Amino acid sequence: MNPDLLWLVVLALAVFAGILSGVPVLLAIAGAPTLVALIAASAGQFDLGYFQAVPQRVFGVMTNPLLLAVPLFVLMGLLLEKSQQAEKMLKSLTAALGGNQSALALAVVLVSALIAASTGIIGATIVMLGTITLPALLKAGINKHMSSGLICASGTLGQIIPPSIVLILLGDQISNAYFEAQQEAGNFAPDPVTVGDLFAGALLPGLLLVALYTGYVFLNLRGKASETDETAESPKSSLSELLKNIAPTLGLIIAVLGSILIGVATPTEAAGVGVAGALVIAAAGQGARAFWVASACAALAVLLLILRQSGLFGLEFAGGKIAWTLPTLTAVGAVVVLGALLAAVVMALPHRDVLGSALSETVIITGMIFGIVIAASILSLVFRGFNGDEHVSELLQSLPGGAYGMLLLTMLVIFLLGFILEFVEIIFIVVPIVGPIILQTDISPVWFAVLIALNLQTSFLTPPFGFALFYFRSVAPDTIRTRDIYVSVLPFVGLQLFALALVAAVPALATWLPDVLFK
């Protein structure tokens, strides 16, 4: 056997052994390759010079302006979650839809779509939905299978509905892979693939899934008109509560996503405005003083975005030094004022645990994501040190079916990896390896990215190892057995596979909107 192939097998076994051993994934992904590389180097089979690129990789991750959007979107979602927006929206939407079983179930799907779009974190969304909606669903007479499956499936919508953290990370890696692929093909000035392209490409498939879920719920619960507690409200009261509780969150998501899709703001800028808006929504339920101070903060954020577009905001340099021009002075002054307003928001909040809890969880989640990104970079370097990229290229190109044979095998591998790895590890390990090879063909990078997102979502929902099932198990009562959870998600897995097959068969579902908006 080729020595490189032997060491690649050892590398794969070491990484999976580390992951399955129970040590933190971060240590397994970084430590196992390092150990294998040191052993191989002692046998003269690996050049330790590859590790000289690690500091550059780390610096590149930390200075990537696109990845700066990740902690901002995480904070936006956590602010909405901690301020109990989901519970308020669920109650008012159920009442507005009629207050019966089907209304409650439909409300769960629609509210999940909104919350998933704002958080993009499967674990947080499913735990929140399980805590809030499961008792209400069971109390309304909806059986435990429908209730469990609905929560698990709805909680995974954050994988595909923009603005999604999965799509942001995919955008970074797909962009790099596409650029590398085009350079290999002799195109040294390819059109860039942006996160906005992926957001636009994932919008229709995401809405398709919401439509499939709502259709399934309606067909199964139609005619079951047992009333829930919310029907005591009058139609007028229901509508006013609906507008009061849903309009702010929906408006925030539309503003954030719309500003990216029409090219007014970058994902990072839009995420910053989203945090300001989420702060206002969170403060609105905690007293008038907090609301007005947070509103001033949000207004300043929007004003800064307008000034940025007009060229009146931003640091300018001359001769390697900061030039104290009007845009520079505006930027410095805005940072000072914005910092003062944020401090005022903290002081004005009667219940500061909302903001404090959101900030602390943001630090933990962001640290985990960036730690895994850096660890995956180390794994990638060791993999390339054993010429793994060349061996993968030879394997994929030898498959029958050409580009679509490569795509099918890649999707199968990603689906199986979804049982044991989180989306961050999969994106930063698999895409850099197979992306440059697959994207040298005529496969659209946007379509490829959307298929990966849908595939990950399906994998996380599929028994017996889907992550969504374990998250739900942690909040489900003892009366709902693990077997019940497995059975409950099977219809939704079928809907997921149908959506995945439809997008695979009709690429225009993923490519039409980006072409209309950006070309």
PLM region spans:
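Alpha-helical transmembrane segments of multi-pass membrane transport proteins
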Residues: 1-519
